[in-house]
Amino acid sequence: MESQMPFNEKIDYGLHALVILAQYHNVAVNPEEVKHKFDLDGKGLDLVAWLLAAKSLELKMKRVKKSIERLPFIHLPALIWRDDGQHVILMKIDTQTNRYLIFDLEERNPKVLSAAEFHEIFQGGMILITSRASIMGQLAKFDFTWFIPAVIKYRKIFVETIIVSIFLQLFALITPLFFQVVMDKVLVHRGFSTLNVITVALSVVVIFEIVLSGLRTYIFSHSTSRIDVELGAKLFRHLLALPISYFENRRVGDTVARVRELDQIRNFLTGQALTSVLDLLFSFIFFAVMWYYSPKLTIVILLSLPCYIAWSIFISPILRRRLDEKFARNADNQSFLVESVSAIDTIKALAVTPQMTNIWDKQLASYVSADFRVTVLATIGQQGVQLIQKTVMIINLWLGAHLVISGDLSIGQLITFNMLSGQVIAPVVRLAQLWQDFQQVGISITRLGDVLNSPTENYQGKLSLPEIFGDIAFKHIRFRYKPDAPIILDDVNLSVKQGEVIGIVGRSGSGKSTLTKLLQRFYIPENGQVLIDGHDLALADPNWLRRQIGVVLQDNVLLNRSIRDNIALTDPSMSMERVIYAAKLAGAHDFISELREGYNTIVGELGAGLSGGQRQRIAIARALVNNPRILIFDEATSALDYESEHIIMQNMQKICHGRTVIIIAHRLSTVKNADRIIVMEKGHIVEQGKHNQLLENENGLYYYLNQLQSN
């Protein structure tokens, strides 16, 4: 191992780099603990200590020397070092613009460098780093190999399918032989008794062939249906386990389009393509028999096979590009459709139906055009296969007739050979014609792989602690949503005592909601710690945490179920008494009781059957029903009418009793009775105190906001 890699001994950039890289790989790390264990002399992590610390976190490392031309092919992020010994993390490379996104640990900011600028700081040495979970994820990558364990799991059924296929091929081999006997023996010698025997035998063979063919289809469909169920269940579980950042970085329609690719895989598994592969594997037996009849005619058949393969190889890349384009256009349509249906109130209110229709027509035309190009190319591919097949048939007819005339082959043998060649060519032709399906399912697996190969929230090795009490601490929090995004929170320090009611106010974009997202462990801060009862949330099980936090947002989603089911969503077996108690606490019981079906009333999709105030009160009841020790109101009343807000505020004292409550609001009247009010501006806490105390500072932001709202 090289030893000349410089690590700055005065400023501990090594620890900071380790924390960032570990968090990127969803590995929880406590910086203070790492420093305590490995920074024994207090001078910062040197190279050996850094490697030992990374190993203790089960991170896999590899020190390499790379030329700048090879960098686009390595797995990022990676740690590189500069001439002055200060660490730099290479985050991303844009090969089109030849620019490099780095994270400067000294300035704690991302930078975009040109190739020349990056070349000045890059000496060729770097540390590639990944986690064991990432390695296991790569080994379990979803692609065609995913189906191998499934085949092994159902190997008994597939063995039965192969056995049935063997018998079917034997029957397919016997039938042409019967025809040869009829042509060369029965017709020549006028053997009616032999004809009767052959007819009965052929009838028996046909019956068995039909029964076995149906049995094979049933067995195969049964096994593929099981695989389909496993894949569908795995897909949905994995989708819900993905971190919230996955969904925030993708359009809803794009995700829906990827999930719908499961239909393509389902059609492929239950179709005739795989049985055609089995039939093709048994073609070697037919080739042996055909060679026995006529080596010359068999050579013609064999020479046609490379033509099928070459034609498929020629068509495949063009077809794949057009299928990719078709998928992209379909994803655009899905996204626009979801967006339009979700925003139908706005579309109608603004009377922009013509504009939206115009956009849809253009996108639909693009999709139809892409689909048409796929269809045309697929048709060309199929006709090319037909051309090869017909050409081989003509050559065999001409050559076979010459062999019969010369006495090298009988008429019965020629007919038998053509029937056998049909058994060989048929699965080849079917596979060639189904090549579009192979291409489509390959693209579908790639699209699904974007979902199934994305890392889920890491629960393994996380702490499931006892019931929380509600002490909260944010220590030196620094956070941004993406490495190249602006800083949202910068060196935020905040302590909240158990049972304290905190109000957080500030301008839009000041970082108020981001604080609560960190508290729910939707994200891990770039720097600093979020603590509950002294426990670092980076080390905690997210499910354990979220079960003990109640959250009410400005736009809460209700499922298309009964009111009771929505309130008791986390525990369907919950007693009715608990549901009613939570509803009373949220001020929802009275209006629920006035409904014809009461708590059994179906709320409609997204709660469309209720008013905004009613939906909000049900959402509050849902947040309270588990008696959470921490309660978050994130603009929970900003969109309500004054009557609905008044009902909720009347019950606020009961709601907050015995809990730690964080209220984020733009209306200062919502938080003026809080124990403490936090004022945020551009990712910093600029003021804090009680309502009256903050009003005393006429130069403060809180006073300014209060004056605006008062006026």
UniProtKB/Swiss-Prot annotation:
Peptidase C39 domain residues: 1-129
User: Where found, per UniProt?
Assistant: Cell membrane
Keyword Coiled coil belongs to the record? no
- The disulfide bonds in this chain are none
Residues in ABC transporter domain copies: 472-707
Q: Which GO terms describe its cellular component?
A: plasma membrane; type I protein secretion system complex
Q: Which GO terms describe its biological process?
A: killing of cells of another organism; protein secretion by the type I secretion system; proteolysis
Q: InterPro entries, alphabetically?
A: AAA+_ATPase, ABC1_TM_dom, ABC1_TM_sf, ABC_transporter-like_ATP-bd, ABC_transporter-like_CS, ATPase_T1SS_HlyB, P-loop_NTPase, Peptidase_C39
Keywords, in A-Z order: ATP-binding, Cell membrane, Cytolysis, Membrane, Nucleotide-binding, Transmembrane, Transmembrane helix, Transport
The reported result of mutating S638R is: In serotype 8
- Topology relative to the membrane: Multi-pass membrane protein
Q: Does the keyword Transmembrane helix apply?
A: yes
* Record note on what altering T416A does: In serotype 8
The UniProt entry annotates the active site at: H87
Entry's Gene3D superfamilies? ABC transporter type 1, transmembrane domain, Cysteine proteinases, P-loop containing nucleotide triphosphate hydrolases
Q: Of which family is this protein a member?
A: Belongs to the ABC transporter superfamily. Protein-1 exporter (TC 3.A.1.109) family.
Q: Which NCBIfam families match?
A: type_I_sec_HlyB
The protein's assembly and partners: Homodimer.
Q: What does this protein do?
A: Involved in the transport of the toxin RTX-III.
- Which protein, by its recorded name, is this? Toxin RTX-III translocation ATP-binding protein
The scientific name of the source species is: Actinobacillus pleuropneumoniae
